[in-house]
């Protein structure tokens, strides 16, 4: 590839700027969660995996957790299986759990592994069922709606424990786990778990340096319909205020809960970035300005410089 001198200078400046972060994060663990939306777009998928490949080759221990909601809905409709979501969470009956396994463990996981092979990432596809990675129980019916309707989520699980043994063995051997959020109870009954929830639990169990949530939005927005209202950083109290004010709703609700769980579980920093940006992850991790939203336990722990431009 021929590079003009101006481009060479720009690339060198970028490397120099990123060098402190590369040194800082070498050997650290990042959990990256990508929703099914990214996998509906081959170019977005490639861009995401290319960025993860760079992290991997820089020595970051990456665990990739993927969703598959749009693909699951599409296949369910094609098979005549009805879809219902409550507060951003899918109700999963017996037919739906079969479709879920087909999409998550079969379609999405395998496609990601194929992309990893193309980009020279040694990756291994697993689910929460494998080696008892995610142990869960079937969620009891709960009242969530405004009218007090009792909601039975069906074959949806709530996490009991995360056993990171298999993840650590893979990471210690230079392999990148690609995790489907499917789990099972102690009797082996398959359970669907929100991918944000699984990513947060894995991040906490690994005491990850970062949890990175890749979404269709540029980050957390002050105004849901205005992408220019990006919030550069906030903390748990700020997140709570946004939820109380109704500025976090629908599909962002599980993400907000996952962010809180991850930080309270020991993850230092959570980032919400856009998968639609070709440099969403790298720009967030390796620049002072960032590209999305940083969430920490308490913004007062950030330095003034960090509060102006946060890596």
Regions from the PLM with identified roles:
Residues 1-277, 282-283, 289, 297-311:
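Nucleotide/pyrophosphate-binding catalytic subdomain
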